C-alpha cells in the first residue's frame, strides 16, 4: 500500500501519479488461453511454378511482392516433414505424437488469404531445382535485413550465399551490397509466422537434410528476449547457478524485473515450446523478456559480465532513465566477489585421498574480503566498509576496462570505460 502524502499548509491529501505511457507486457501462455491456433493467412491457389518465377524475378528487380514471397515459401516448404521421437506439446496444444510425421505448417492453422495476389513476371528458366536454394536465400535475407551495421550485413550476405551454393549449383546472387528492399519484410505478420514455423520445426529436427535453412531463421528464436539472455550469459561467465545468481540481486528494480521474467507457466525452459517464437508468431506484442521492459536487470547483468571480462557485453545497449549509481555498485560488488574467488574444489579422488576444508572463525577482519561467493558474507563486508566501493574494487574495475577500445556510444562498454577508467 502506498504511503499517504499530505501538504504541510493544510494537511490535504494528494495522490501522486504518472501517466500510463507504456503498454503492459504480454505473456505467451495468455495467448493460448484465448486462442486455439496461430493462424497463417497465405494464398494457396497459385501454382508453385508460377510463384517461383514471380519471386525470383521480383527479388532480381528489387521489388518483390511479400504476398508472392509468403505464397512461394508455403508452397515450396509445405511438404517437408519429420518423424517425431517423442510427443510434441506446447501450451496444451498437441503438435504431434511420438512416431508421427509432422510438417512445418502443422505448427499453425493455414487459412486462405482473401487478398488477390498481384501479377508477377514469368520465367521459363526456373525449375524445381531452384527450390533447393531460393527459400534459403529469402529467409536469409530476413536475417540480413534485421542488422543495421553495414559491415555485419555484408558478412551475413556472404555467408548466406555460401549456404545457397552448397544447397544447389543453380544458385544465383540476386542482391547486391547496399540494397535494403527486404528490410521491411519483418513488418509482415504472415511472413514472420512462416519464419518462426520454419525455425521451430528445424530446431526440433536439427539433423534434417533441409535444416541449413535455419541460417536465416535462427534470429527468430528468442527474439526480443535480450534480458533473459543476459541472465543466462551472466550465469555462464560468473560460474554461478541461476539460483545462486538470483541471491545476488540487490536492487528493487532488478528484483521486480526478474520476477516479471520468471512469471510461471511460460515454458521458458522448454526447448520445443512456442515461447521462443512468441514475437514472430504474434503471441505477444510486448515481450516480458526484452531489455526495453527490463532495463535495470539488463544493465546490471551486462555490466557485471563486462567486469568479468565478457567480450560480448561491451556492445550491449545502455538503457536510458535508470538508477545508474546503485545498479553500478551492485554490479561491481558481484563481479568483484566472483573475480576475487576461484570456485575450484576437488572433483574426483582415489582411495581415501580426499581434501576437506576446515572453517576458521577465530579471526574476522572487516577489511579482508570473504573467500567464497556467499552474498551474505559479501554484504556484511561491504557494509563494514561503509557501504561503498573500496579502492580494491575500483582497481578491479579499472583493470577490467583498461584495454577496451573502439567502443560505440550508448553501450555498456562505453559507460564502464568512462565510469571506471579514470
UniProtKB/Swiss-Prot annotation:
Disulfide bond residue pairs: none
List localization entries: Virion; Host cytoplasm
What Pfam families would the database entry show?
A: Rhabdo_ncap
Please provide, in alphabetical order, the Gene Ontology terms of the cellular component aspect for this entry. helical viral capsid; host cell cytoplasm; ribonucleoprotein complex; viral nucleocapsid
Q: One MF term from GO for this chain?
A: RNA binding
Q: Does the keyword Calcium apply?
A: no
| Entry keyword set | Capsid protein, Helical capsid protein, Host cytoplasm, Ribonucleoprotein, RNA-binding, Viral nucleoprotein, Virion
What SUPFAM superfamilies does the database record attribute to this sequence? Rhabdovirus nucleoprotein-like
**InterPro entries assigned to the protein according to its UniProt record, in alphabetical order:** Rhabdo_ncapsid, Rhabdovirus_ncapsid_C, Rhabdovirus_ncapsid_N, Rhabdovirus_nucleoprotein-like
Say where the protein is mainly found: virion
Q: Where is this region: Interaction with the phosphoprotein?
A: 350-390
Q: Which family does it belong to?
A: Belongs to the vesiculovirus nucleocapsid protein family.
What does the UniProt record say this protein does? Encapsidates the genome in a ratio of one N per nine ribonucleotides, protecting it from nucleases. The encapsidated genomic RNA is termed the NC and serves as template for transcription and replication. The nucleocapsid is bullet-shaped with the tip containing 8 turns of a conical spiral before reaching the helical cylindrical trunk. Nucleocapsid assembly is concomitant with replication, therefore viral replication depends on the intracellular concentration of free N, termed N(0). All replicative products are resistant to nucleases.
User: What is annotated about its quaternary structure and interactions?
Assistant: Homomultimerizes to form the nucleocapsid. Binds to viral genomic RNA; this interaction contributes to the virion assembly. N in the nucleocapsid interacts (via C-terminus) with the P protein (via C-terminus); this interaction allows to package the L polymerase in the virion and positions the polymerase on the template, since P acts as a bridge between N and L. N(0) interacts with the P protein; this interaction prevents the uncontrolled aggregation of N(0). Interacts with the matrix protein (inner layer); this interaction contributes to the virion assembly. Interacts with the L polymerase.
Q: What is this protein called?
A: Nucleoprotein
Organism for this UniProt entry: Vesicular stomatitis New Jersey virus (strain Ogden subtype Concan)
Amino acid at each position: 500500500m502506498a504511503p499517504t502524502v499530505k501538504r504541510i499548509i493544510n494537511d490535504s491529501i494528494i495522490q501522486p501519479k504518472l501517466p500510463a505511457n507504456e503498454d503492459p507486457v504480454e505473456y505467451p501462455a495468455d495467448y493460448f488461453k484465448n486462442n486455439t491456433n496461430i493462424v497463417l493467412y497465405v494464398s494457396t491457389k497459385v501454382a508453385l511454378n508460377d510463384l517461383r518465377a514471380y519471386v525470383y524475378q521480383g527479388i532480381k528487380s528489387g521489388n518483390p511482392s511479400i504476398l508472392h514471397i509468403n505464397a512461394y515459401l508455403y508452397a515450396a516448404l509445405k511438404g517437408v516433414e519429420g518423424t517425431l521421437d517423442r510427443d510434441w506439446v506446447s501450451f496444451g496444444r498437441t503438435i504431434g505424437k511420438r512416431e508421427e510425421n509432422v510438417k512445418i505448417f502443422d505448427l499453425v492453422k493455414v487459412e486462405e488469404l482473401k487478398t488477390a495476389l498481384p501479377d508477377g513476371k514469368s520465367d521459363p528458366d526456373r525449375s524445381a531445382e531452384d527450390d533447393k536454394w531460393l527459400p534459403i536465400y529469402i529467409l536469409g535475407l530476413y536475417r540480413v535485413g534485421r542488422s543495421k551495421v553495414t559491415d555485419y550485413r555484408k558478412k551475413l550476405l556472404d555467408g548466406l550465399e555460401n549456404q545457397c551454393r552448397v544447397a544447389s549449383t543453380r544458385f544465383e546472387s540476386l542482391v547486391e551490397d547496399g540494397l535494403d528492399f527486404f528490410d521491411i519484410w519483418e513488418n509482415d505478420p504472415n511472413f514472420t509466422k512462416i519464419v518462426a514455423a520454419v525455425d521451430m520445426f528445424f530446431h526440433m529436427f536439427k539433423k534434417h537434410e533441409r535444416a541449413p535453412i535455419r541460417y536465416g531463421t535462427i534470429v527468430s528464436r528468442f527474439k526480443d528476449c535480450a534480458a533473459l539472455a543476459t541472465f543466462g550469459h551472466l550465469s555462464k561467465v560468473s560460474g554461478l547457478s541461476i539460483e545462486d545468481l538470483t541471491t545476488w540481486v540487490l536492487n528493487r528494480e532488478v528484483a521486480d524485473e526478474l520476477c516479471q521474467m520468471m512469471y510461471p507457466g511460460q515454458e521458458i525452459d522448454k526447448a520445443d515450446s512456442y515461447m521462443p517464437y512468441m514475437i514472430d508468431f504474434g503471441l505477444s506484442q510486448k515481450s516480458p523478456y526484452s531489455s526495453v521492459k527490463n532495463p535495470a536487470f539488463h544493465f546490471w547483468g551486462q555490466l557485471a559480465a563486462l567486469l568479468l571480462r565478457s567480450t560480448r557485453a561491451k556492445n550491449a545497449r545502455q538503457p536510458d532513465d535508470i538508477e545508474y549509481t546503485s545498479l553500478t555498485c551492485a554490479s561491481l560488488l558481484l563481479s568483484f566477489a566472483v573475480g576475487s574467488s576461484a570456485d575450484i574444489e576437488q572433483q574426483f579422488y582415489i582411495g581415501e585421498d580426499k581434501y576437506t576444508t576446515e572453517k576458521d572463525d577465530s579471526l574476522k577482519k572487516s577489511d579482508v574480503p570473504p573467500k567464497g561467493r556467499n552474498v551474505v558474507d559479501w554484504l556484511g563486508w561491504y557494509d563494514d566498509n561503509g557501504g561503498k566501493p573500496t579502492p580494491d574494487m575500483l582497481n578491479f574495475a579499472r583493470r577490467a576496462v583498461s584495454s577496451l577500445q573502439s567502443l560505440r556510444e550508448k553501450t555498456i562498454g562505453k559507460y564502464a570505460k568512462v565510469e571506471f577508467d579514470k
